[in-house]
From Swiss-Prot:
The lineage of its organism: Bacteria, Bacillati, Chloroflexota, Dehalococcoidia, Dehalococcoidales. Part of the 30S ribosomal subunit. Gene3D superfamilies: Ribosomal protein S10 domain. Keywords: Ribonucleoprotein, Ribosomal protein. NCBIfam families: PRK00596.1, rpsJ_bact. This is Small ribosomal subunit protein uS10. One of its GO terms (molecular function) is structural constituent of ribosome. InterPro entries: Ribosomal_uS10 (IPR001848), Ribosomal_uS10_dom (IPR027486), Ribosomal_uS10_dom_sf (IPR036838). The keyword Ribosomal protein applies. It comes from Dehalococcoides mccartyi (strain ATCC BAA-2266 / KCTC 15142 / 195). SMART domains: Ribosomal_S10. Belongs to the universal ribosomal protein uS10 family. It holds the Pfam family Ribosomal_S10. One of its GO terms (cellular component) is ribosome.
Length: 102
């Protein structure tokens, strides 16, 4: 066992797929015998946009759109030799961004 700390950040627009991916990562890491903490839900980033419906006049008539970016954090406190192999062999669904820092 090494004392290398690995931090995994997951980002996505759909929180259900994000939670499934986090669970898949946690299960794969527990099979290797690594000590983990998480997944920790981080604050959701909400971007709001207002667009004028009409192309010419009527500024009073606007449409609002928003994009919600959900985030999860997983820390691997103690790794084993199989941990990195398990992380590289994972097949995560489309729509989930993963960022791994050593």
């Amino acid at each position: 066992m090494t004392k290398q700390k690995i931090r995994i950040k997951l980002k996505g627009f759909d929180h259900k797929i994000l939670d499934q991916s986090a669970l898949q990562i946690v299960e794969a890491l527990e099979r290797t015998g690594a000590t983990i903490s998480g997944p920790v839900p981080l604050p959701t980033r909400i971007q709001r946009y207002s667009v004028i419906r009409s192309s010419f006049i009527d500024k009073d008539s606007q449409e609002q759109f928003e994009i919600r970016t959900h985030k999860r954090l997983i820390d691997i406190v103690e790794t084993t030799s199989k941990t990195i192999d398990a992380l590289t062999n994972l097949n995560l669904p489309a729509g989930v961004s993963i960022d791994i820092k050593l």
